[in-house]
């Protein structure tokens, strides 16, 4: 059973030889492969090289296109700079005044360099891994993308002061995401991640008003193309987790800040699994083997065995390689303790 087969079987509720391991590796991957982060973000072959190397070196079951949240924002007009070996920096947001929303148009992925690059990354994965790994593309979720083009503080006040304009922007963002999903899946994606990171900052009422239906629409489109859907929201999503599950996403990431998920398990549908939730800093980066083991076992029990092994968010670049290798080894230990699904 290879990594692709293992991941798909586990998601579907079938047998697997061990628990799938899906760590989020971005800055860690670039550092491990000796690649400048600017190149990791901007050169598809370099990002793919780093991710494939990490998948081999750390027994990861997936490869993905994550590096930063700015591809769509740049296409909408947010101006960025790319430091030599650091995350991209915002120089000017696309929506400075609320009236700028009136000029927004649905993106055509082929017209924008970084959107084309993501499709190229998927094509490289498809050609170079030959169905071995679970390939995951990415789009920004509606609210996260709005924050990327507006500024997170302004975006949050806009929800109250300019709801009509925000709805218009979110509709355009959602249609743009749909347009971006299609070529990614056609290029060879098995899964599309929806990164709506900021949704943990809003109330359940605001999540339902501005985010839920749009995320569900993205999930439905992904499914219509025959791919799996994953939702990643940073922070404590306890208050909105029931709604997130109702989007129909196949994989729901659980941040370490989220309260125990036991009460939500009854809402997990057939073919839905969680992913998480070890703390990337206190557990993976700074912890020892016993702390890592305890964290993995705790969440796996909490999730009733319906969880992909991962951290709650990105593995830090300061994580010792030995800690990540031990973390990966827990996939076998978890499978030995629990029958898969």
Language-model features: locations:
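Membrane helical hairpin/interfacial module
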Residues: 58-71
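Loop-to-helix transition at the N-terminal end of transmembrane alpha-helices
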Residues: 45-48
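Membrane-interface helix-loop-helix modules in multi-pass inner-membrane proteins
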Residues: 95-101
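Active-site loop segments of alpha/beta catalytic cores
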Residues: 1-30, 35-40, 50, 54, ...
């Amino acid at each position: 059973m290879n990594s692709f087969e293992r991941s798909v079987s586990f998601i579907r509720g079938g047998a697997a030889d061990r628990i799938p391991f899906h760590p989020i590796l971005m800055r860690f991957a670039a550092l491990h492969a000796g690649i400048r982060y600017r190149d990791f973000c901007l050169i598809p072959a370099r990002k793919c090289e780093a991710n494939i190397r990490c998948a081999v070196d750390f027994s990861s079951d997936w490869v993905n296109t994550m590096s930063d949240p700015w591809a769509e924002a740049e296409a909408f007009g947010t101006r960025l700079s790319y430091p030599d070996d650091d995350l991209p920096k915002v120089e000017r947001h696309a929506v400075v005044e609320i009236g700028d929303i009136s000029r927004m148009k649905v993106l055509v992925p082929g017209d924008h360099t970084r959107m084309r690059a993501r499709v190229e990354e998927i094509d490289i994965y498809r050609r170079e891994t030959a169905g071995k790994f679970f390939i995951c593309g990415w789009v920004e979720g509606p609210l996260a993308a709005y924050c990327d083009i507006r500024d997170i503080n302004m975006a949050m006040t806009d929800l109250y002061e300019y709801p009509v304009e925000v709805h218009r922007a979110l509709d355009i963002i959602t249609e743009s995401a749909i347009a971006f999903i299609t070529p990614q899946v056609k290029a060879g994606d098995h899964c599309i991640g929806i990164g709506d990171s900021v949704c943990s900052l809003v109330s359940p009422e605001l999540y339902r008003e501005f985010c839920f239906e749009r995320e569900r629409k993205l999930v439905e489109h992904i499914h219509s193309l025959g791919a799996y859907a994953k939702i990643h929201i940073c922070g404590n999503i306890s208050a909105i987790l029931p709604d997130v599950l109702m989007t129909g996403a196949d994989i729901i990431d659980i941040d370490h800040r989220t309260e125990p998920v036991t009460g939500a398990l009854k809402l997990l549908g057939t073919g839905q699994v969680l992913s998480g939730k070890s703390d990337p800093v206190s557990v993976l980066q700074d912890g020892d083997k016993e702390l890592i083991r305890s964290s993995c076992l705790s969440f796996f029990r909490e999730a009733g065995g319906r969880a992909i092994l991962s951290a709650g968010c990105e593995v830090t670049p300061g994580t010792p390689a030995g800690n990540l290798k031990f973390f990966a080894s827990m996939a076998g230990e978890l499978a030995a303790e629990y029958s898969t699904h």
